[in-house]
Amino acid sequence: MPIKLNASFSDSYVDVSQYRDQHFKGNRYEQEKLLKQSNTLYVGNLSFYTTEEQVYELFSKSGDVKRIIIGLDKVKKTACGFCFVEYYTRADAENAMRFVNGTRLDDRIIRTDWDAGFKEGRQYGRGKSGGQVRDEYRQDYDPARGGYGKVVARP
């Protein structure tokens, strides 16, 4: 029988961060309202090799997962280090924000944030080369995220 983590105060929502999706179609107030009602989490800093099954195994400990959308490089169609996790209820998503954010998955410290809701096309990285923007400018070598940054000149 799977273990389910429950927060003792799951009726209150976890604070919304200052990050806002620049591609959101609507104003800041509308986005804030959606974030405070959302059942969807953005998960970042994943290894390029982390599988949907690994994400499910971790996030299902906080509640019933409706679906997982793995972020893809828009050119290569390979994983590029992020995903969206959608729960059936806000309370289960709040549990994940409390208990999963900052934990280790596939030898990486992952971060979670509220997402206004997945829409088709958002599964693709927004970087110029097809992946995530932050990976294009990384100066260190990170084999789990594709090696060196693609834009930064190597010594």
Curated annotation (Swiss-Prot):
Similarity field: Belongs to the RRM NCBP2 family.
Residue span of region Disordered: 122-155
Start and end residues of each RRM domain: 39-117
Annotated binding of mRNA, by residue: Y19, Y42, R111, T112, D113, W114, D115, R122, Q123, Y124, G125, R126, Q132, V133
Listed GO CC annotations: cytoplasm; nuclear cap binding complex; nucleus
Swiss-Prot/TrEMBL keywords: Cytoplasm, mRNA processing, mRNA splicing, mRNA transport, Nonsense-mediated mRNA decay, Nucleus, RNA-binding, RNA-mediated gene silencing, Translation regulation, Transport
Listed name of the protein: Nuclear cap-binding protein subunit 2
Compartments in which it is found: Nucleus; Cytoplasm
Pfam families membership: RRM_1 (PF00076)
SMART domains found in the cross-reference section: RRM
Superkingdom of the source species: Eukaryota
